[in-house]
Amino acid sequence: MNNKIRRFPNKNLKMPESGINFMSMLFFSKIDNMVYFINPIKYNTNANIAILEKIDDDDETRGKVTFIPIKYLEILYNELVLDPNHINNINFENNIKRKFFLFWTIKKYLQDKNININTFITSKKYKGIPLVYMRKSFLKSELSKTRDFSTFATIYDDLDAQIGIPPLGFNPKPKAYPRKHDKSTWLSSGDIYNCIYPLTMINTDYDYFHLILFEKTDKNIATVASSMRCYKLEDRVKFFLMNDKKRFFMFPIIYNDHFTCCVIDKHFDKDKKAAYFFNSSGYIPELIKQNKKYMFIESDMTIKSHKHYNSTPNTNYAYLYIDVLSEYLNDIFKNVNYYFFNTFELQYDSPDCGMFNIIFLYYIVYFNIKSKFEFKKLYYSMSFIGDLLASSYRGALFISRYDINSIDEFKNTLEIFNIKNKKFMELIDMYKKNSNRIMNVCSKIKNDYDSYIDNEKNSLESNI
């Protein structure tokens, strides 16, 4: 933990992440979409609801019985069944029962023909999207363990302690940071790809590249060839720049065993391009060599150019990849005019840098973020995400081994089943408790309002 890192007031005040913080995020998301928010109640099954709500227009049956849309089941039924007119002689009470009949007829056909289900849904497409993307992907890593960020001491607590002031905040007894986590909980670039790439098939302005991996970075030879693996990246960028249907190019980055990510907007301002970087540990402008193209987003959401900071003459090793990558991107993208970096720290402890990046990229594609203000709102929305929430969303956006018996069973299951892993249940518990708190608060506000109206009415009557 570096004491030059900036943090948001909600973290310095140690507002409970699972309480006040989650409640604020839930409430703000309902007020003209002030913040971006993934509502966990929509992610309670193995269906990839983010895809289905875009392509499955049957509200009654979407995400029920099977993740395959009913209209595509009807197409398959007509293609595969010997007597497709048979269904027209059956009187179904509702579309759910109709979908149930279609599904089990097709499933029996696949079993009788000894057709592998996973191969089948990988090869078949509906509205241009493979059926395999209509279910969530399987999480090969372990679920991570972490605590609410309000339980951790902050740099300001440390400074308070130095001058004899006891810790101040909603949680007055902060705990020490725990030991390092087991690598079995680390996400892979494949996990990020499986979660984000399918969304780019719905909102097609976004192009996703699988990974830029830094094996090493030589301070004296800051060239891509000496430090970075990015197989076929240049070819992808050339195609992207020629493709008028694509505006954003995004990719995760691994450097020093830490995930960060970058999103490039080729139409940031007319013919100018911009690169948005996100780091759950934050960037420290004072430790990065001066660059006139670098812009830093502070915890109060102001954006400052690099010249406003007393920066080091040589970039610290922790951020050296930025200099390498910005030079390289500037070359292959034919000049990038602005590079934006968040200065604020979100991740205190957990092994969930991958999940922080998934949430950042998920917000962008799912909410179709494009404008400068929307990106600024995106960085603000991330301020509500800490170790606990990032860890909990792992249980919502993926299927884990705690939800189904094995990966083989997962691959060969077409039916809808409920998510039951502890991380998802933890998230739902937060949702329930904080929804009740909001309703109780709203009830108190209503009582105050009604009392005010009654008093005002009585006052008017007494003056008549």
UniProtKB/Swiss-Prot annotation:
Keywords attached to this entry: Hydrolase, Late protein, Protease, Thiol protease, Virion
Q: What induces it?
A: Expressed late in the viral replicative cycle.
Q: What residues form the catalytic site here?
A: 258, 269, 353
| InterPro entries the UniProt entry points to | Papain-like_cys_pep_sf, Peptidase_C57
One Pfam entry for this protein is Peptidase_C57
Where in or outside the cell is it found?
Virion
A single Gene Ontology molecular function, please? cysteine-type peptidase activity
Lineage: superkingdom: Viruses
Its main subcellular localisation, reduced to a broad class, is: virion
Give the protein's biological function: Late protein responsible for processing most or all of the viral core and membrane proteins known to undergo morphogenesis-associated proteolysis. These proteolytic events are involved in the transformation of immature virions (IV) into mature virions (MV).
This protein's name: Core protease I7 homolog
Q: Which organism is it from?
A: Amsacta moorei entomopoxvirus (AmEPV)
